[in-house]
Each structure stands twice: as structure tokens, then as C-alpha cells.
Amino acid sequence: ALGENINVMSKKGMMLVDMGAGTTEITVITMGGIVVSKLLKMGGNTINAAICQFVKERHHLVIGDKTAEALKIELGHAIPGRGKQKRVFGRDLITGLPANVEVADHLVFDALKDYLFQVVKTIRNIMETIPPELSADIIESGIYFTGGTTLIPELDRLFSASLHVKTVFADKPL
């Protein structure tokens, strides 16, 4: 928050969402204090593991974490339907030999959506439990997002549409 010139000492309530590699932290602050904070033990690494699992189940191909990360970066999108593909290499589960397949962006979206749904659900739950004055402040100022996982394209559109709140993404999320 401090790196993005957000005044954490403000009397206005703010929601900060840090979408990191290993965890996602959703925090509401006001006057320099934490009102509520929820830590999800999931993040970008969770998405990578899901991509590995989806490729394994749908293509019978074992891929590594670096390949999953490349798929997430190149095909990952919070809104489905771009129609892009990427060829990946791995080990065929049936023959045990090296093999390659074309992975479609909708597979990567399928791997992303459970994580994104959980983040939206947690933000909604927090918004429902905080005092109305803080909710009003957050609706006015928006929800602030940071962390490497926020680099997934169209997250702003997804969160704005799902939460009906303005979203503000860090210029330098890492």
C-alpha cells in the first residue's frame, strides 16, 4: 500500500487485495489499523498446479511448473473466449515418451476460474460483514489490487463486474 502512495492512515476505509504466488490476502484498513484480514492459502502457484492437472487430465500429458507458468502468462485471461493456443511439451502418460500438444486458452481459463471465484467470494463475504460506513468508503474509492497474479489480463473487468465496485490495480504489482 505504501509503495502505491495509498494513505493507510486515512479515516476512510480501504480494501487491499494482495494476489501473490503462494497466498492471497484481503484486508480492510482504516486510520492505520486493520479492521479485518483474510488470508487465502492460494495464489499464482495454485493456478500453475491446476493448469498442470488440467493438461494431465485432458491431454494425458505431464508438464512441469515452468510450462504451466508459461501457459498462465501467455494464455491466462480472466474473461474466456479469445481462441488462442500454445504448443507445449511434456511426457505422455500412456507411452512415457516425450510428446507435445496444443493447449487452448479455455483450458487455462478453466484452471483459473476456481481461484478467481474464491477471491470474489471472499471479498463479498468481507463486504457483507464490515460496517456500512466502511463499505461506502470502499465503494467510493474502489478496491486496490497488487501482487504478481494481478498481471492476468482482464482481472479488472472480472472483479468490477462481479463485485459492482471500481477496481484499482497497482502500476508495479511485483
Where do the model's predicted regions map?
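Short coil/turn connectors at secondary-structure junctions
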Residues: 9-13, 23-24, 140
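Conserved phosphate-binding/catalytic loops in two-lobed NTP-binding clefts
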Residues: 157-174
